[in-house]
Amino acid sequence: MSNPSPQVPEEEASTSVCRPKSSMASTSRRQRRERRFRRYLSAGRLVRAQALLQRHPGLDVDAGQPPPLHRACARHDAPALCLLLRLGADPAHQDRHGDTALHAAARQGPDAYTDFFLPLLSRCPSAMGIKNKDGETPGQILGWGPPWDSAEEEEDDASKEREWRQKLQGELEDEWQEVMGRFEGDASHETQEPESFSAWSDRLAREHAQKYQQQQREAEGSCRPPRAEGSSQSWRQQEEEQRLFRERARAKEEELRESRARRAQEALGDREPKPTRAGPREEHPRGAGRGSLWRFGDVPWPCPGGGDPEAMAAALVARGPPLEEQGALRRYLRVQQVRWHPDRFLQRFRSQIETWELGRVMGAVTALSQALNRHAEALK
């Protein structure tokens, strides 16, 4: 008798055959729907495209070559771009050439800057650092030049800042010691902890009064003038001298305070304006006291209110070292290039600028950066 061959159950066999077919059919349907979604976008039928994605939320809005965001930038289709961003399209998605949507928008020229480049940049600022296969970033395509935000530059700026602050602190301490040396009579006086300026001035006033009283007593012991007249005159003279001393101490305190503020302002230069310092919010009253965002005129331009980029660049150069000192002038221009580089400026001040003014401000910053680059090239 022959053994009967093992039989595979019908349900198991049908399941093993249907699974790959079902998966392939599902993938094919999804790809057809994604192609239909892209056709709707190309034809301008945005309502149908949105409805299709709502019925089938699993579709990939970035699928296709080139991706839909790249197509919208190339066709200058701003409504399609806004719809894709609202539906979750990724501006950092790269095509087969390594380009992101920001690369595609940057290649469309200045006309596409406000409607295409800025919305993509606002959605994904980190995409500015992505390079394509040619090694280009979106900023380099726009002509912004290489960014100066490398780790070495950051460390160099930090070391220069620390060096300047140490130098400033040393000068202030020297000036403080010089002022104290004018009034101290006893060099052996020691303090356990630093005393404030007001306590120091009060102590000097008391010591001066005690010294004067001692001199008066010694003078009275050697030659005794008439008691009533001499006593009243000495008190009047003592009060007058104490009053003059307090006035001089207050004047010196005000002078020191102004000197510290002036040196600190010179040390900070054109850094980010702080609420406690004079800045664009004091120059433009409409932005002060109510925490409003900056407009174009509120930005701390080199020239008040902005203006011609060449004029602003010339003003910055005029504030630096003389032309005879080529090395110092080049270092100064390098610092200004870092400060007014569009990438750096956007990272630091984007949250403080009105959205509808951002395009105009960044256009002026870009032009100023290019003018500074030309000045730096002229020194080579």
Curated annotation (Swiss-Prot):
Its main location: nucleus. Residues 1-34, 131-166, 185-293 are annotated as: Disordered. The modification Phosphoserine is found at S150. One of its GO terms (biological process) is negative regulation of tumor necrosis factor production. InterPro entries: Ankyrin_rpt-contain_sf, NFKBIL1. GO terms for cellular component: nucleus. The keyword Cell membrane does not apply. Keywords: ANK repeat, Nucleus, Phosphoprotein, Repeat. Coiled coil: none annotated. Residues 237-286 have a biased composition (Basic and acidic residues). ANK repeats lie at residues 64-93, 97-133. Signal peptide: none annotated. It is found in: Nucleus. Interacts with CACTIN (via N-terminal domain); the interaction occurs in a pro-inflammatory-independent manner. Involved in the regulation of innate immune response. Acts as negative regulator of Toll-like receptor and interferon-regulatory factor (IRF) signaling pathways. Contributes to the negative regulation of transcriptional activation of NF-kappa-B target genes in response to endogenous pro-inflammatory stimuli. This is NF-kappa-B inhibitor-like protein 1.
